[in-house]
């Protein structure tokens, strides 16, 4: 099985995450995201989650307001890719506690890290949720130690938001504008 790309788009067709496992020019990548995104967003919920686009089979699944999309070879197993997507979402749910679009916007590095732990060069590398979560916990510990060394350990979004008289969500939204 060879995954060519994985990307996440919102209902508004905004790209939230993109990982490419095959070589394409930036123009071709942008064209693929636009075309596949439009096709997927126009499909009805009861329609099949597999479509063919050029020389690729597109497998997608919607979770809340996000579409998780993967492009694979035409002869690859679509159900296996759906399971990989589901496993990825399960790990993100455990990592973020019911993952949402804002989690992916503000913690995109974790989303990429989890994907990199699970898929390498387009092949499923680590299917075990506990193993991926353990690696993520180690990364968080390392990051916390590095931040403590820099004096950033005590930065608290809630405290900053209260000082500005905003909710944490309003505070996060002010950065997305």
Predicted regions and their residues:
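Intrinsically disordered, Ser/Thr-rich regulatory regions of eukaryotic membrane-trafficking proteins
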Residues: 1-177
């Amino acid at each position: 099985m060879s995954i060519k790309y994985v990307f996440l788009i919102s209902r508004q067709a905004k790209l939230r995450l993109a990982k490419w496992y095959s070589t394409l020019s930036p123009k071709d990548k942008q064209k693929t995201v636009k075309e596949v995104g439009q096709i997927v967003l126009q499909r009805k919920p009861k329609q099949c989650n597999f479509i063919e686009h050029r020389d690729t089979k597109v497998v997608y699944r919607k979770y809340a307001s996000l579409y998780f999309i993967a492009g694979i070879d035409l002869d690859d197993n679509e159900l296996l890719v759906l399971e990989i997507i589901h496993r990825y979402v399960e790990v993100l749910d455990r990592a973020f506690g019911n993952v949402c679009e804002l989690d992916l916007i503000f913690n995109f590095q974790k989303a990429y890290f989890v994907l990199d732990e699970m898929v390498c060069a387009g092949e499923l590398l680590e299917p075990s949720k506990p193993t991926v979560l353990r690696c993520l916990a180690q990364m968080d510990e390392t990051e916390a130690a590095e931040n403590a060394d820099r004096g950033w350990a005590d930065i608290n979004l809630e405290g900053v938001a209260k000082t500005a008289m905003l909710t944490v969500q309003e505070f996060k939204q002010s950065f997305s504008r």
